Swiss-Prot record:
Family to which this protein belongs: Belongs to the class-II pyridoxal-phosphate-dependent aminotransferase family. Histidinol-phosphate aminotransferase subfamily.
InterPro entries: Aminotransferase_I/II_large (IPR004839), HisP_aminotrans (IPR005861), HistidinolP_aminotransfase (IPR050106), PyrdxlP-dep_Trfase (IPR015424), PyrdxlP-dep_Trfase_major (IPR015421), PyrdxlP-dep_Trfase_small (IPR015422)
Cofactor(s) needed by this chain: pyridoxal 5'-phosphate
Protein name: Histidinol-phosphate aminotransferase
Catalytic reactions on record: L-histidinol phosphate + 2-oxoglutarate = 3-(imidazol-4-yl)-2-oxopropyl phosphate + L-glutamate
EC number: 2.6.1.9
Complex formation: Homodimer.
HAMAP family from the UniProt entry: HisC_aminotrans_2
Keywords: Amino-acid biosynthesis, Aminotransferase, Histidine biosynthesis, Pyridoxal phosphate, Transferase
Recorded metabolic or biological pathway in which this protein acts: Amino-acid biosynthesis; L-histidine biosynthesis; L-histidine from 5-phospho-alpha-D-ribose 1-diphosphate: step 7/9
Taxonomic source organism: Rhodopseudomonas palustris (strain TIE-1)
């Protein structure tokens, strides 16, 4: 007897594995540092706005997320008509793949790029092409060398998760200039709010002046609205029109839109989170090497910690050691980084405890 057969590429997809969610136990404090969630939570104004929608849950959302698009446009100086909102930037990434990829096409991403990219690519029957990195950083020359006549889309996480590295805006522009004009360049800026580098730019200028580049962003990180699944895209009119044709008409709920509008207006909340992150990025980059560990310098709200391969000091053993003590980090085997753990920058207490416990694990006084 025959049975349904999935489309080409579906069974080649390795299911996405999110960061571990610890199970709370009575009398035991647990810190989840595995999913790059903000320790500050959402803005109080966002919480109040979310609750304000409770009396009208019978109403469908306005179909284009107009109030949220206008708020994003005002915050970034963008034309709201060139913005699309989605249920997390994940939905938008998948919509882009569905719009521009088909069997026989190719999409390029970097060696340690976000795992949603190959999932979205393969789900549409296209080939996932991996470009090697240099020092855990996107290599523009390698990406350009990977281009073939079948290339239709390039994924660029800038900055990148899980490495925490970035490329300067001049390199982004060089990448765009070197790509054929029919290739869509997707600038995934999920962690852009944490970057404090003069040579980094979001990419608005590039999107504004081309017809083949888009920018995606999220409310899950610095705004603390991961549970509500809200993301957005800024793009040229031709791409916005194409993606809107397959976007679900009510894809962002009213409570989520109201919370996001309030969140983007609370700049003080964002700045407090940025300052806290920057302080601990520097502290961890200074203290962890003293324990015999290597840290990839990050511009995000997490750090990538590399462990020795010596028995008793490995990343897997460190992961088990920390988890037992209520400190849950992210193992990265599925990213091709089996000897590293990714640590979200958490509260002062959580970060200090990680340092204290890693000092014990590494046998340092």
């Amino acid at each position: 007897m025959s049975r349904p057969v999935p489309n080409p590429g579906i069974l080649d997809i390795a299911p996405y594995t999110p960061g571990k969610s610890p199970v709370a136990e009575p009398g035991r404090k647990v810190f989840k540092l595995s999913a790059n969630e903000t320790p500050f939570g959402p803005s109080p104004h966002a919480i109040a706005a979310y609750k304000s929608a409770a009396d009208h849950l019978e109403d469908y959302p306005e179909g284009t997320s107009r109030i949220l698009r206008e708020a994003i446009g005002k915050a970034y100086g963008l034309d709201p008509d060139r913005i699309i909102c989605g249920a997390g930037s994940d939905e938008i990434l998948n919509l882009l793949a569905h719009t521009y990829l088909a069997p026989g096409d190719e999409a390029i991403s970097s060696q340690h790029g976000f795992l949603v990219y190959p999932i979205a690519t393969l789900a549409n029957g296209a080939k996932n092409v991996v470009a090697p990195e240099k020092n855990l950083t996107t290599d523009v020359d390698a990406m350009l060398a990977a281009v073939t006549p079948n290339t239709k889309l390039v994924w660029l996480a800038n900055p990148n998760n899980p490495t925490g590295t970035y490329i300067p805006f001049d390199e982004v522009k060089r990448l765009r200039a070197g790509l054929p004009s029919h290739v869509v360049l997707v600038l995934d800026a999920a962690y852009a709010d944490y970057v404090m580098k003069n040579d980094y730019e979001l990419g608005i200028e590039l999107v504004s002046t081309t017809e083949n580049t888009v920018l995606t962003h999220t409310f899950s990180k610095v705004h603390g609205l991961a549970a509500l699944r809200i993301g957005w895209m800024f793009g040229p009119a031709n791409i916005v029109d194409a993606v809107n044709r397959i976007r679900g008409p009510f894809n962002v709920s009213v409570p989520a839109q109201l919370a996001a509008v309030a969140a983007i207006q609370d700049t003080g909340h964002v700045e407090r989170s940025r300052a806290h992150t920057d302080k601990w990025r520097n502290t961890l980059a200074e203290e962890l090497p003293k324990l015999g560990l290597t840290v990839t310098r990050s511009v995000c709200n997490f750090v990538l910690i590399h462990f020795p391969t010596t028995k008793g000091k490995t990343a897997a053993e460190a992961d088990a050691f920390l988890t037992q003590r209520g400190l849950v980090l992210r193992a990265l085997n599925n990213y091709g980084l089996p000897h590293a753990l990714r640590m979200t920058i958490g509260t002062d207490e959580a970060n200090a405890l990680v340092l204290e416990n890693l000092r014990e694990f590494m046998g340092q006084p």
